[in-house]
């Protein structure tokens, strides 16, 4: 089976779809470009399907390199047969390749190797091949200076047999089947650690056991974290060790023969000392990998929802980074997000300069014609919100904005480059203000892991996490589109086909030559060639440019089709964009070619319906319950407004405007069964919740979204 056939089977796609998608990827096309502008080639595959093909292609490519290494290593040992090469070449299962390689894999000096050095290999083979012979008698002929008793000879033979059993593919497969069906994951507190403060959060796992196949990703990752911190000891074993040993031994032990006891001892040793630890390690790795995949999926879903949160748009904004002792950092931004003014006010304890702070805020709101105020939701956030609302300034909207990652940004090289003359507090306030105006444009400057929507993000595979999050950011940026004349280099970096180097070149060119008047002007940017232009042009927008199509997602390679449509309708392109009736009268089949079919033509008309539209909607004003300031103010049964901050497999965390986030367990999300919480809620969604339980000692709040109307 070829890699293309294998991917097609795994993803339930046609081979032609996979073949053409891989060809496009190998030519340097990006996932957003392929899914948006090459629908005819892929058979209409969406971004998720294209990404899945790309990931499978990457994994199989890695396996191909591994297979080449295995063949080379075995060949160097002079042990490569035609049959062995054929098996490796035809295998697309990494576990099978590992099993084939195992007997040839260089290893530390083992008990079996030491026994072979003593000349005991023939004895081991006699026990296996002539089990009717007397083992004691056979062992007599192998005594020498290093082997002084028959039992020593038999022990060495058993060591050789044990290693042979542990490296036998069939033995390993037998135990794998047992693990797959009935493996149990067990967690115990490490002796002397249970009463330590750091162990408290793992209390649920001090004496925990469940079938591995039922262990959810968050439980498994919690146990593994406890293990890495030295609090828990985690094992994965068959439900019945004796039965597993018997099944492994069955292939080798011939009941009733004289050698049966020796072979059984060797098989038991193989199972306990070599085989079970090896398969346990394998299942620990695969179960962790599966848990990682699920945690990364949850993280990527949350990140996507956060990045695609509705923007307020180009408005004059006041950003406030609240604080008590250090004061509140206040900045005023123009409609493009440029910093106009900054100062610090001290309305809260210990200074309590409330009147002076109110006067300063009124002055700034007026002087800079502020249209909206963005207040960080961290320390002193609620108190600052109440202060600003009490001013009752007409025409000014007030928003609490997530501070997650703002401090990371403010101390970053990007922030220093943007604001070299300001300290971290001013940069943080600017980030909060800009985050309200355009969450996507601001959040791309921050490492996604610092945004606070991950589930065990520090415990999962770092490489897989980075690939997924980078792909998520790229997907969001290209789904929205980017204003070529206002976008930062950071935002442009994620545009299809660009990257950091070309993004910087675009900004440098824009600074030197002024705004771009046309997408075609991109070709004047140094080192931006035809391929990069093909990949990026459709995702870049020029507002009020020379060609109205430059403010749409219509790709420049298809402008001629729109021009033909306009000519056939007896008008120019701007008139066609403004005339929905004329567009409805068009017969799309007239414009079909070998390269361009109805999917692309339908997309073109959809773009002409709403040129330059932002798919994210618009930010809505939200207020927390004014009487709630801490967990002490909560009462069971209260119905409160909240904002979803994180969605996990087991439910959703909700911000109630206090330090402690509440949890709506998956069973409390709706009056029906919910398999995936993302079916019901999303990050940044405004919800109403009912307080079910309050555990002040552990800082936990249980909430429900049932019966809250």
Model-derived features: where do they sit?
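Generic start-of-chain signal for non-secretory N-termini
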Residues: 1-19, 26
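Long, highly charged, low-complexity intrinsically disordered interaction regions
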Residues: 3, 61-79, 89, 408, ...
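Duplex nucleic acid-engaging cores and interfaces of nucleic-acid transaction enzymes
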Residues: 33, 49-52, 59, 63-319, ...
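Short, ordered loop/turn segments at secondary-structure junctions
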Residues: 37-39, 128, 239, 322, ...
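Structured, non-catalytic alpha/beta "coupling" segments that mediate domain-domain communication
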Residues: 73, 87, 98-101, 226-240, ...
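A glycine-rich phosphate-binding loop feature that marks nucleotide/adenosyl-phosphate handling sites
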Residues: 177-184, 320-324, 378-383, 401-408, ...
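Single-stranded RNA-binding regions, centering on S1/OB-family and related RNA-binding modules
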Residues: 542-546, 550-709
């Amino acid at each position: 089976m070829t890699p293309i056939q294998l991917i097609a089977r795994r993803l339930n796609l046609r081979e032609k779809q996979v073949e053409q998608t891989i060809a496009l990827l190998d030519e340097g096309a990006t996932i957003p470009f392929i899914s948006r502008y090459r629908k005819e080639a892929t058979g209409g595959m969406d971004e998720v399907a294209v990404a899945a093909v790309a990931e499978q292609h990457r994994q199989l490519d890695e396996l191909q390199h591994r297979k080449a290494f295995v063949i080379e290593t075995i060949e160097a040992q002079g042990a490569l047969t035609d049959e062995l090469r054929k098996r490796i070449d035809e295998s697309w299962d990494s576990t099978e390749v590992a099993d084939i390689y195992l007997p040839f894999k260089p290893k530390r000096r083992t008990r079996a190797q030491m026994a072979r050095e003593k000349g005991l290999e023939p004895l081991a083979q006699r026990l296996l091949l002539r089990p009717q012979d007397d083992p004691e008698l056979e062992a007599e002929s192998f005594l020498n200076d290093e082997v002084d008793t028959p039992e020593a000879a038999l022990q060495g033979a058993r060591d050789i047999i044990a290693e042979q059993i542990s490296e036998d593919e069939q033995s390993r497969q037998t135990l794998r089947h047992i693990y797959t069906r009935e493996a149990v994951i067990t967690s115990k507190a490490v002796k002397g650690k249970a009463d330590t403060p750091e162990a408290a959060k793992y209390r649920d796992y001090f004496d925990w056991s469940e079938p591995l196949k039922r262990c959810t990703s968050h439980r498994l990752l919690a146990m593994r974290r406890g293990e890495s911190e030295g609090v828990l000891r985690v094992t994965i074993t068959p439900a019945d060790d004796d039965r597993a040993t018997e099944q492994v031994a069955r292939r080798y032990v011939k009941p009733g023969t004289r050698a049966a006891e020796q072979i059984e001892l060797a098989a038991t040793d193989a199972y306990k000392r070599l085989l079970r630890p090896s398969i346990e390690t394998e299942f620990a790795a695969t179960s962790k990998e599966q848990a990682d995949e699920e945690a990364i999926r949850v993280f990527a879903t949350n990140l996507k929802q956060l990045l695609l949160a509705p923007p307020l748009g180009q408005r004059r904004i006041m950003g406030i980074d609240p604080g008590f002792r250090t004061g509140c950092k206040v900045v005023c931004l123009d409609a493009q997000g440029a910093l106009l003014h900054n100062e610090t006010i001290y309305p809260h304890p210990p200074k309590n300069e409330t009147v002076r702070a109110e006067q300063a805020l009124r002055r700034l709101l007026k002087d800079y014609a502020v249209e909206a105020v963005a207040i960080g939701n961290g320390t002193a956030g609620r108190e600052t919100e109440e202060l600003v609302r009490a001013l009752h300034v007409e025409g000014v909207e007030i928003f609490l904005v997530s501070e997650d990652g703002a401090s990371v940004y403010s101390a970053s090289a990007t922030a220093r480059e943007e604001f070299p003359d300001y300290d971290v507090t001013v940069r943080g306030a600017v980030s909060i203000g800009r985050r309200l105006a355009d969450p996507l444009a601001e959040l791309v400057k921050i490492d996604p892991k610092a945004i606070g929507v991950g589930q065990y993000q520090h415990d999962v595979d770092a490489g897989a996490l980075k690939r997924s999050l980078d792909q998520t950011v790229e997907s969001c940026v290209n789904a929205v589109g980017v204003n070529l004349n206002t976008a930062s280099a950071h935002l442009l970096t994620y545009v299809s086909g660009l990257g950091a180097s070309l993004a910087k070149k675009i900004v440098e060119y824009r600074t030197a030559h002024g705004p771009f008047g046309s997408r075609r002007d991109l070709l004047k940017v140094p080192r931006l060639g035809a391929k990069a232009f093909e990949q990026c042009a459709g995702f870049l927008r020029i507002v009020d440019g020379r060609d109205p199509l430059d403010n749409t997602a219509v790709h420049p390679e298809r402008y001629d089709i729109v021009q033909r449509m306009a000519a056939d309708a007896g008008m120019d392109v701007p008139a066609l964009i403004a005339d929905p009736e004329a567009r409805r009268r068009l017969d799309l089949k007239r414009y079909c070619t070998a390269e361009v079919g109805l999917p692309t033509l339908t997309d073109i008309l959809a773009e002409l319906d709403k040129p330059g539209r932002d798919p994210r909607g618009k930010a809505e004003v939200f207020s927390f319950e004014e009487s709630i300031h801490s967990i002490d103010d909560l009462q069971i049964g209260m119905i409160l407004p909240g904002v979803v901050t994180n969605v996990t497999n087991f439910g959703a965390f909700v911000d109630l405007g206090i330090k402690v986030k509440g949890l709506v367990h998956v069973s409390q999300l709706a009056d029906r069964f919910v398999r995936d919480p993302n079916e019901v809620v999303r990050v940044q969604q405004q919800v109403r919740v009912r307080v079910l339980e309050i555990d002040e000692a552990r800082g936990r709040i249980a909430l429900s979204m049932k019966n809250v109307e």
